[in-house]
């Protein structure tokens, strides 16, 4: 009687083993799901490749910008020539003045063109990009009054430029002298007033 009872228990163990095998299959299904999860990030890696391609497109856009900037400098040179030609038309009142003034303005045109050509490559080497656009525009508006005319004034009107610098230096010296002279008397006067008050 006892032996069949053990056989029944053994059969029970076999029945327990079968669901264990089924559980293993279910776990195998979970592993397949994990593999699918691993495949999804691989698609994200492909998306990263597309992002890198966009970066390359950005680089290609920057190169034509350099070309457009250089074209802008050439256009500015042409505008400077046109403005000078307008001044010549205004001065063309006297026949004698035409010949003399034309020779002077032609020399100025050639000098200004050379100065602009020397400045633009130096800026392109240092900045190469968007900074080169911003600085020359500011120099053409305000910088011309400081840099290019200063060179022209030294060649054409050197005396006027020297007089301006002399006046600035004289003003600075006068301010320093007044400041030095005003300090010692201010220190000496108050003690005299105090002694007078004490005597009274």
Curated annotation (Swiss-Prot):
This protein's record includes keyword Electron transport:
no
The UniProt keyword set, sorted, is: Cytoplasm, Hormone, Repeat
Q: Basic and acidic residues compositional bias: what residue ranges? A: 8-33, 111-140, 146-158
Where would one find coiled-coil regions in this protein? none
The propeptide segment or segments lie at 1-178, 197-200
Region named Disordered: 1-33, 106-159, 178-200
Q: Which InterPro entries match?
A: Prosystemin/Systemin (IPR009966)
Q: Looking at the keywords, is Cytoplasm present? A: yes
Ranges of the sequence repeats in the UniProt entry: 3-8, 37-45, 80-88, 117-125, 145-153
Signal sequence segment? none
**Record's GO cellular component terms:** cytoplasm
Q: What does its record list under induction?
A: By wounding; in leaves.
Q: Subcellular location, in the record's words?
A: Cytoplasm
Please provide, alphabetically and separated by semicolons, the GO molecular function terms listed in this UniProt record: hormone activity
Where's it mainly located? cytoplasm
One Pfam family in the UniProt entry? Prosystemin
Query: What is the reported tissue distribution?
Result: All organs except the roots. Transported out of wounds to distal tissues.
Which purpose does this protein serve, as stated in its record? Activates a lipid-based signal transduction pathway in which linolenic acid is converted to jasmonic acid, a potent activator of defense gene transcription, including proteinase inhibitor.
The protein depicted here goes by the name Systemin
């Amino acid at each position: 009687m006892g032996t069949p009872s053990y056989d029944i228990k053994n059969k029970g163990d076999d029945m327990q083993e079968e669901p264990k095998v089924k559980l293993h299959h279910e776990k195998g299904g979970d592993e397949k799901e994990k593999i699918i999860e691993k495949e999804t990030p691989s698609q994200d890696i492909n998306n990263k490749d597309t992002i890198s391609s966009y970066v390359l497109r950005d680089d290609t856009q920057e190169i034509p910008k350099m070309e457009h900037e250089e074209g802008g400098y050439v256009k500015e040179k042409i505008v400077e020539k046109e403005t000078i030609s307008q001044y010549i038309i205004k001065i063309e009142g006297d026949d004698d003045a035409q010949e003399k003034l034309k020779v002077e303005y032609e020399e100025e045109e050639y000098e200004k063109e050379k100065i602009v050509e020397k400045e633009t490559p130096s800026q392109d080497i240092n900045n190469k990009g968007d900074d080169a656009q911003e600085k020359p525009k500011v120099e053409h508006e305000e910088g011309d009054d400081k840099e290019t005319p200063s060179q022209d004034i030294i060649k054409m009107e050197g005396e006027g430029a020297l007089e301006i610098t002399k006046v600035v230096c004289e003003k600075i010296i006068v301010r320093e002298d007044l400041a030095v002279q005003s300090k010692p008397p201010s220190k000496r006067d108050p003690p005299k007033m105090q002694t007078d008050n004490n005597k009274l």
